[in-house]
């Protein structure tokens, strides 16, 4: 009897230990799952949305990109990540400029653009050879350079942002639209500027309507053009509509047929986008793309108008870091000196 009693006691002890083990595992597992669930449920609410801004930093005008970045970062509290795109030879210099200047606090990623993707897609003849530089076509390849974002802002390097970039990012893109641009016809004070510097703002200025391929598009030559120097893009739609492939198709057609007008000298990258996005893009608030500051050194906007502008764009030959140029004081206030001493301002010659 004593032996059986001891056996029963041992079995009872083992049973109690087993039950305790099972109970511990359940409680511990439940706590772990609860913690994980809490993290998963809280993170989307607590995590501030990241705004990706893509900007190119070309070797000869790297100071432009740094000034643009400085103006964007200084005028917002938004959570930004800058994708600074360059050719392989310039990447160390880009990093040094950022890390050894006031820009060291920004969140950034340096992205290499491989120009071999452009082989056979660019005609060598242009009235403005600088527009044939590989980085001018980075905007065609946004989904290949930025992978983890649904919505992306692309900016030319010769811009200064005076508003909160969050406003531009909040631009509504209509269903089925892969991008938003600013129309050339809805720019405040645009008519005065166009008359003054002789600019065109229609497809006629970019496409050669003498060519059958252009005529067959059925696009009226008087259709208002847009400027792709400021883009808000939906990456899902861009990939779904195979925008990059479409743009490459029209680049190759131009190589074969010389389809684009050289009258403005700016149709190299703009013209394919005008064709691919015709009637299929949303619009940006005009104040978020005040342009033509670089077309004529004698053409000036009013100071009041410039103060209202959210973004200034010196598109054209006359850049604000060079001479002659206009409104360069607005640009120079955001200039970040080159730690290597290579990029210099040339305002007084």
UniProtKB/Swiss-Prot annotation:
InterPro entries: Glyco_trans_8, Glycosyltrans_8_dom-fam, Nucleotide-diphossugar_trans. GO terms for molecular function: UDP-glycosyltransferase activity. Gene3D superfamilies: Spore Coat Polysaccharide Biosynthesis Protein SpsA, Chain A (3.90.550.10). GO terms for cellular component: membrane. It comes from the Eukaryota. The keyword Transmembrane applies. It is found in: Membrane. It holds the Pfam family Glyco_transf_8. It is a single-pass type II membrane protein. The keyword Cell inner membrane does not apply. Residues 25-349 are lumenal. Residues 1-6 are cytoplasmic. Signal peptide: none annotated. Keywords: Glycoprotein, Glycosyltransferase, Membrane, Signal-anchor, Transferase, Transmembrane, Transmembrane helix. Glycans are attached at residue 234. Its EC number is 2.4.1.-. The chain crosses the membrane at residues 7-24. SUPFAM superfamilies: Nucleotide-diphospho-sugar transferases. Belongs to the glycosyltransferase 8 family. This is Glycosyltransferase 8 domain-containing protein 2. It comes from Mus musculus (Mouse).
């Amino acid at each position: 009897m004593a032996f059986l009693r001891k056996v029963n006691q041992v079995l009872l002890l083992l049973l109690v230990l087993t039950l305790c083990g099972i109970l511990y595992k359940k409680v511990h597992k439940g706590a772990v799952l609860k913690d994980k669930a809490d993290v998963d449920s809280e993170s989307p609410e607590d995590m501030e949305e990241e705004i990706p801004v893509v900007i190119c930093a070309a070797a000869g005008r790297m100071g432009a990109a740094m000034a643009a970045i400085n103006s964007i970062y200084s005028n917002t509290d938004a959570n930004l990540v800058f994708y600074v795109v360059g050719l392989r030879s310039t990447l160390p210099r880009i990093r040094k400029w950022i890390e050894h200047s006031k820009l060291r606090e920004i969140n950034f990623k340096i992205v290499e653009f491989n120009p071999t993707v452009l082989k056979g897609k660019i005609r060598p003849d242009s009235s403005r050879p600088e527009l044939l530089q590989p980085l001018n076509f980075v905007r065609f390849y946004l989904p290949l350079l930025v992978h983890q974002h649904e919505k992306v802002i692309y900016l030319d390097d010769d811009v200064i942002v005076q508003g909160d970039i969050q406003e531009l990012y909040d631009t509504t893109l209509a269903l089925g639209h892969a991008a938003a641009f600013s129309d050339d016809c809805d720019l405040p004070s645009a008519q005065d500027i166009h008359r003054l510097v002789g600019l065109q703002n229609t497809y006629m200025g970019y496409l050669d309507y003498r060519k059958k391929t252009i005529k067959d598009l059925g696009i009226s030559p008087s259709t208002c053009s847009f400027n792709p120097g400021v883009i808000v893009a939906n990456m899902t739609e861009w990939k779904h509509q195979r925008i990059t492939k479409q743009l490459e198709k029209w680049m190759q057609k131009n190589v074969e047929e010389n389809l684009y007008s050289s009258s403005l000298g700016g149709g190299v990258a703009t013209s394919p986008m005008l064709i691919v996005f015709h009637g299929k893009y949303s619009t940006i608030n005009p104040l978020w793309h005040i342009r033509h500051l670089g077309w004529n050194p004698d053409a000036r906007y009013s100071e009041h108008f410039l103060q209202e502008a959210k973004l200034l764009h010196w598109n054209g030959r006359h850049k604000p870091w060079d001479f002659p140029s206009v409104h360069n004081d607005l640009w120079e206030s955001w200039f970040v000196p080159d730690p290597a001493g290579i990029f210099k301002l040339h305002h007084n010659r």
